[in-house]
Amino acid sequence: MLFWIIKITSYFYSSTLFEVMNSVLFRGVGGLFFSLFISIVIGNRIIVWLKYKLRMLQTIRIDGPQSHKLKYGTPTMGGIIILISVVTSVIIWSDLSNIYIWYILFIFVMYGILGLVDDFLKIKRGDNLGLTILNKYLWQSIIAWILIVIMFINRVNYVENQSGLEFLRNIVCKLKIWDMILAYFVIVGTSNSVNLSDGLDGLVIVPVILVVSGLAIVTWVVGNIYITSDLYIEHVDCIKELVVVCASIIGAGLGFLWFNSYPSQIFMGDVGSLSLGGVIGLVSILLHQEYLLLIMGGIFVIESLSVIFQVSYFKIFKKRIFKMAPIHHHFELKGYMEPKIVVRFWIVSSILVLLSIVIFILSKY
């Protein structure tokens, strides 16, 4: 919105200032501070609203670590803070004529709604189950496939004089079914991985901020034709606008961390983790950096693998590899204090993000 106001104004009042204000870098910084401001301003109000008016309090697992009983009475659904802050910031600071922005908003909002339903059912039923695994996976898949089909059809160049059969054949050839399947697994897989990682105060939001920061750097590089030509990196047209989205998520994440740091005043809930994970996966697809995400989001991968190995091993051998999965609970049961586990996960995530950026640059030589 602000992009077009500045653009229209610059037609009547030509100025270098307007050019700077309309740059992606300026709007990215603006989006970051704006979403940070919004999240801090609305944070306390939403916490009070969820805790005292709606009574949306986190249910505690009976078989979980004993220390988690102290968390009873803490409100959940804190991802609403992030959702409102990011969507508002993106609408104000980004170029809404860019199709990538709408892809991001679609997956962010739809996965947010799905997470909201899941959180609500957990609280209503008084357990920690919510939607069944099958139902959650089904709706994640439906949302992902709707977006993927739209994305890949938009990549097809329509030729008016083609016959219906020729046009259909052209679409089928250019859709690249394997790319679509990969995109599906990246979106749904990342969404669930971030969701599994959300189990301790501040544990997931900082790795999300770090990974999104890494993706913002990659976005800036692949979106700049001069940098890509110098580094022999694949250039992606119009992708640089996603810097504004990434910056808005970073700002909202920092604002949420203000309330989610130990001891947490509010939990993110599925409304936040599913939507953030979906966006991270989608951005990596749009950047053509799906494999780089495996390193950059290594913390999420480790958390997911710990659950997969635990469940598989138990079904086969009737024994457990870890005391509890995901793996952050294993460390809790081994006697590590929650803040120490969280900070160490942050350190590992920082290293992985830096390593992935180095690999991204050096792999082109």
Curated annotation (Swiss-Prot):
- Show the PROSITE patterns listed in the entry: MRAY_1 (PS01347), MRAY_2 (PS01348)
Under which main EC class is this enzyme filed? transferase
The transmembrane segments are 29-49, 73-93, 97-117, 133-153, 171-191, 202-222, 242-262, 266-286, 291-311, 341-361
**So which cofactors does this thing need?**
Mg(2+)
GO cellular component assignments: plasma membrane
Enzyme Commission code: 2.7.8.13
One MF term in the entry's GO annotations: UDP-N-acetylmuramoyl-L-alanyl-D-glutamyl-meso-2,6-diaminopimelyl-D-alanyl-D-alanine:undecaprenyl-phosphate transferase activity
The annotated pathway is: Cell wall biogenesis; peptidoglycan biosynthesis
Q: Which UniProt keywords apply?
A: Cell cycle, Cell division, Cell inner membrane, Cell membrane, Cell shape, Cell wall biogenesis/degradation, Magnesium, Membrane, Metal-binding, Peptidoglycan synthesis, Transferase, Transmembrane, Transmembrane helix
Q: Where in the cell is it found?
A: Cell inner membrane
* UniProt keyword Transferase, yes or no: yes
Primary site of residence:
membrane
Family, as annotated: Belongs to the glycosyltransferase 4 family. MraY subfamily.
- NCBIfam families recorded for this chain? mraY (TIGR00445)
Q: What is this protein called?
A: Phospho-N-acetylmuramoyl-pentapeptide-transferase
